């Protein structure tokens, strides 16, 4: 609480290319602070969905296309929980950056609406537009904005250098070819590592400038991916990882880097978690009052239900995994038995995370909840949440269906007095 925050959604990031020798800055950041051992990136592909989920603490409406995404819809919605808006209310200076053109996915609209003074490669950032562009150049062109402003500050970056295709026509792969040419990998894997080195160089420059400005010990750095690096074949990703990956679950294992510089010792968290959980966790850590009933993600450091959720509604918990594609339950060990009733409760719980999230964005629900001017959508019998003045830990889905605001078996029912179909769920 009170520290500066620099947050990254890193294009096609994978922790498997991190090493102390090749990427010392990423290695340090990923081994210092709060270590989330069982974090999974939710998405196979589509940057806008992964970025949306991280920024909103909600799942996107999966029926939408990339050009009509949930992020586009949210561009005119009331968004009180996004970090840009939430930290502005706490007196932070807030900045947002992307090293490609600003109207790609309409980030010039969506990111301003999240509370950021937003700059992109063609609007405020003096960098070369390439495919992909340089994360290092973006850092060099942006860091003075917030280091020269008053503290505290929050900066958000959507990176680009790690974008596929992974060959030597990729501008960043070609730039960093010499650094990887002797590595014992195939050409596509070397090209993947090469373009991702540009993120390492950007982070190295960031840390250098934080030290020079005297604020390194007051600045937290958080980083995760937007999606699995789908530009690599499964065989190439196995090669990068150095092991045969479980394609249903483990290929989604990723990093929620939460670098906190002045902890006396690292905090290790073994709860299962995924992309939507980052926002509520950071809101808690930075002392922002919020109502957890209105987010699909869960503060990973809180008590309650913890799971990693994937985009096809497969999920992982400490006791079992569920493959939604095959409707298969995989217990953590042979002594664990999952009843049909318990599985159904979990399955509906995950279904409703997606349903609630879609309805929130499609109806501009937060505007109704907080009595703000809405960009569109109408709801009857809504509840204004005026009873919560501090952080409140109750899973949003549990609140919604226990109080009749979601009918798990009727996807179109939201905001009215639906009859809950699911019994009590373990808190």
PLM regions: where:
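Solvent-exposed soluble domains appended to multi-pass membrane proteins
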Residues: 1-379
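Extracytoplasmic Gram-positive cell-surface binding/anchoring modules and repeats
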Residues: 379-427
């Amino acid at each position: 609480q009170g520290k500066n925050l620099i947050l990254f959604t890193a294009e096609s990031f994978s922790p498997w290319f991190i090493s102390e020798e090749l990427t010392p800055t990423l290695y340090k950041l990923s081994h210092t602070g709060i270590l989330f051992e069982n974090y999974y990136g939710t998405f196979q592909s589509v940057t806008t969905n992964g970025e949306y989920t991280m920024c909103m603490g909600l799942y996107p409406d999966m029926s939408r296309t990339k050009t009509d995404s949930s992020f586009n819809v949210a561009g005119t919605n009331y968004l009180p929980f996004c970090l840009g808006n939430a930290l502005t209310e706490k007196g932070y200076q807030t900045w947002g950056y992307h090293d490609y053109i600003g109207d790609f996915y309409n980030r010039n609209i969506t990111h301003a609406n999240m509370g950021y003074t937003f700059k992109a490669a063609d609007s405020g950032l003096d960098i070369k537009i390439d495919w992909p562009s340089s994360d290092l150049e973006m850092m060099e062109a942006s860091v003075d904005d917030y280091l020269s402003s008053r503290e505290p500050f929050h900066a958000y970056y959507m990176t680009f250098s790690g974008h596929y295709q992974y060959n030597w026509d990729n501008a960043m792969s070609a730039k960093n070819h010499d650094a990887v040419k002797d590595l014992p990998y195939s050409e596509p894997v070397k090209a993947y590592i090469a373009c991702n080195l540009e993120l390492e160089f950007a982070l190295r420059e960031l840390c250098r400038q934080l030290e020079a400005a005297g604020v390194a010990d007051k600045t937290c750095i958080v980083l995760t991916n937007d999606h699995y690096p789908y530009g690599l074949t499964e065989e190439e990703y196995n090669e990068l990882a150095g092991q045969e990956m479980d394609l249903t679950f483990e290929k989604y294992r990723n990093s929620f880097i939460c670098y906190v510089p002045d902890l006396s010792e690292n905090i290790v968290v073994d709860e299962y978690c995924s992309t939507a959980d980052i926002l509520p966790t950071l809101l808690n850590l930075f002392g922002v009052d919020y109502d957890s009933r209105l987010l699909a993600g869960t503060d990973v450091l809180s008590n309650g239900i913890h799971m990693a959720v994937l985009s096809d509604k497969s999920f992982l918990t400490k006791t079992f995994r569920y493959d939604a594609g095959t409707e298969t339950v995989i217990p953590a060990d042979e002594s664990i038995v999952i009843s049909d009733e318990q599985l159904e409760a979990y399955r509906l719980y995950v279904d409703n995370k997606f349903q609630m999230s879609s309805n929130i964005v499609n109806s501009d629900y937060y505007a109704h909840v907080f009595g703000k001017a809405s960009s569109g959508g109408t709801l009857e019998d809504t509840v204004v949440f005026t009873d919560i003045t501090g952080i409140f830990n109750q899973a949003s889905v549990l609140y919604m269906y226990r109080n009749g605001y979601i009918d798990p078996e009727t996807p179109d029912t939201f905001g009215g007095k639906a009859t809950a179909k699911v019994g009590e769920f373990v808190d």
